[in-house]
Amino acid sequence: MAMTNCLLALAIAGVVLVSLPGLSRGDGECNPSGAIRSSTTHRCQDCCKAGQSYPTYTCSPPTTGSSTDAVMTLNDFDAGGDGGGPSECDEMYHSNTELVVALSTGWYAGGSRCGKSVRINANGRSVLAKVVDECDSQRGCDEEHAYQPPCRPNVVDASQAVWDALGITGEDVGEYDITWSDA
């Protein structure tokens, strides 16, 4: 009887650990799910380089309710900009004067945040921005993605208007540590 109970307890523990990989790792982080190797180099500064491998992700770090750590990057949502094609949520381009963002694949959550506002905190300020696109963490290095690598799993890709509203200017524009939450 004791042996049966012990085996049952081990089986349950195994199921829990397999079902909740974040608990078995103990870090709650998002690990790469694969990689893309670029076959060509393009002229833009941030474009993929031939022969280089870029990690892909199907996840993002877990959101923590009131504030989730992220890296804000600058995106051009206008037609012809470095954001690639039209926004995933509405198949439209957006002016960079609009307070809009794209979220990494895991946070984009299959479009469940489309049209919703997120609160971004940085530089002692806070701003609300509308989610209009996915910053694709699974694909990249192609024309659809403006030949840029896949998005890292912890990115909030923001329009110039978001940067301006947060008072982030000059050499700080490009990448900036922020926190964000659903509004």
UniProtKB/Swiss-Prot annotation:
Subcellular location(s) of the protein: Secreted
The protein, known as: Putative ripening-related protein 1
Pfam families, sorted: KWL1
Annotated keywords: Secreted, Signal
Family: Belongs to the kiwellin family.
Signal peptide extent: 1-26
Gene Ontology CC: one annotated term: extracellular region
Keyword Heme: no
Record organism: Oryza sativa subsp. japonica
Domain of life: Eukaryota
Hydrolase is among the record's keywords: no
InterPro entries: Kiwellin-like (IPR039271), RlpA-like_sf (IPR036908)
